[in-house]
Design a protein with these regions (language model features):
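Short, well-structured beta-strand
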Residues: 11-28
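Generic structural signal for well-ordered, non-transmembrane alpha-helical segments
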Residues: 43, 47-50, 91, 98, ...
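Helix-loop junctions and short alpha-helical segments
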Residues: 70-241
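Amphipathic, Lys/Arg-enriched alpha-helical patches that create a basic surface
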Residues: 217-250, 263-295
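Extracellular/periplasmic helix-loop-helix junctions in multi-pass membrane proteins
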Residues: 258-262
């Protein structure tokens, strides 16, 4: 498997129908790259197929190019390590948001529906505390924060690893590193970039902004201050992101339940996190980076 599961290979037994269609044997080697696969991923796939043919001979079928035709690398943009890293991080973040959204799209709970259809308002408010769906939506708030932390934290780590200006700033950095961390770096179990990233709290907007402004000259607060249309509502993205962070904090540390958190409200929060990611990616592109999101 390649970085971020962009490139995969596996051996499996094919059906009789597939054997007839592709004129192949019972067992085949199947390789694939996601649509976000880079020049390097396609190159690796070609190399794998060449080695397999040297060992086992036979033919192969390429979905895009036909029988015994290797992928034409000239058809793919060659990304820098930074561009590839951010593309994978952003794609993974958006994909996870899409998965939870699809999961909730068909979710229904008969008990919740019964409570919602009650005509007596006072009884409805009382029974909200027993609504299993409200518990579910509240418990999913930390998931959204995990996406934000992953996206901003890992993008930051990639920048300070590959961006020349950010790396030059590391020269003047005074950071105390414990012996355990030094050993982990020497054994390649950790990296200096990840250790520096760990010194910031990427569940906190002020901390995110501090890290990005110091090393990347990127003002995240300014980027997220835009007013955008999210699920037919005009919102200030920064305000909604702070709502998500605050809700997660109250839920995790105080078990504070928001009994007004509906399915639609949670779906709006998902869309807000996606909007924040896309706005930030757009700011990266304005710096001249080529970034592709597979979603």
């Amino acid at each position: 498997r390649g970085l971020g599961d962009v490139y995969k290979r596996q051996v499996y037994k094919v059906s009789t129908e597939e054997r007839t269609k592709y004129k192949c044997s019972e067992w085949i080697l199947h390789t694939r790259t996601r649509s976000s696969g880079s020049y390097e991923d396609k190159q690796k796939q070609n190399e794998t197929i060449r080695k397999a043919r040297q060992l086992f001979e036979g033919t192969f079928y390429n979905d895009w190019y036909g029988t015994n035709a290797y992928t034409n690398l000239n058809d793919y943009t060659k990304f820098s390590p930074l561009e590839k890293g951010i593309s994978i991080i952003a794609s993974n973040s958006i994909e996870k948001l899409s998965q939870i959204e699809n999961c909730l799209a068909g979710y229904k709970n008969e008990v919740s529906d019964s409570f919602a259809n009650m005509n007596i308002e006072s009884m409805k408010e009382l029974l909200k505390t027993k609504d299993p769906s409200i518990m579910l939506y509240n418990s999913l708030m930390p998931f959204l924060v995990a996406i934000l932390e992953y996206f901003y934290g890992q993008c930051f780590a990639n920048f300070i690893k590959y961006d020349t200006n950010a790396r030059n700033l590391l020269i003047d950095e005074k950071l105390k590193i414990g012996i355990a961390d030094v050993i982990a770096i020497l054994q390649k179990e950790n990296s200096l970039e990840q250790i520096i990233a760990q010194s910031y709290n990427f569940q906190n907007l002020d901390s995110i902004n501090k890290a990005y402004k110091k090393y990347l000259s990127i003002d995240v607060m300014s980027i997220l201050s835009e007013r955008k249309k999210v699920n037919r509502k005009i919102i200030r993205v920064l305000v909604k992101i702070q709502e998500i962070l605050d809700a997660r904090h109250r839920f995790v540390h105080e078990l504070d339940i928001n009994y007004n958190l509906t399915k639609q409200a949670y779906l709006d929060y998902i869309a807000t996190v996606e909007c924040a990611i896309l706005l930030t990616v757009e700011s990266f592109k304005q710096r001249g980076l080529k970034i592709e999101i597979d979603h």
